């Protein structure tokens, strides 16, 4: 269960990073 949550959190972080990159552009 914990591993699943971690994966979900990582995915969300990755998504946020992508958005930040676009904002910088």
UniProtKB/Swiss-Prot annotation:
| Coiled coil stretches, renumbered | none
> Which residue stretches belong to region Disordered?
1-25
GO: which molecular function terms? mRNA 3'-UTR binding; mRNA 5'-UTR binding; RNA binding; structural constituent of ribosome
Signal sequence, start to end: none
Compartments annotated for it: namely: Cytoplasm
Q: Which Pfam families match?
A: Ribosomal_L41
Q: Does the keyword Ribosomal protein apply?
A: yes
Q: Name one GO cellular component term.
A: cytosolic large ribosomal subunit
| Keywords for this protein | Cytoplasm, Ribonucleoprotein, Ribosomal protein
Q: Name one GO biological process term.
A: cytoplasmic translation
- Its transmembrane ranges are none
Q: Which domain of life is it from?
A: Eukaryota
Does the record bear Ligase in its keywords? no
Q: Misc remark for this entry?
A: Initially thought to be part of the large ribosomal subunit. Crystal structures show eS32/eL41 to be a small ribosomal subunit forming a bridge at the interface of the 2 subunits.
The record's comment on protein family reads: Belongs to the eukaryotic ribosomal protein eS32 family.
The record describes the protein's role as: Component of the small ribosomal subunit. The ribosome is a large ribonucleoprotein complex responsible for the synthesis of proteins in the cell. Interacts with the beta subunit of protein kinase CKII and stimulates phosphorylation of DNA topoisomerase II alpha by CKII.
User: What do we know about how this protein assembles, alone or with others?
Assistant: Component of the small ribosomal subunit.
What's the name of the protein? Small ribosomal subunit protein eS32
* Organism encoding this protein: Homo sapiens
The gene from which this protein is expressed is RPL41
């Amino acid at each position: 269960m914990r591993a699943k949550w971690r994966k979900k959190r990582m995915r969300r972080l990755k998504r946020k990073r992508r958005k930040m990159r676009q904002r910088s552009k």
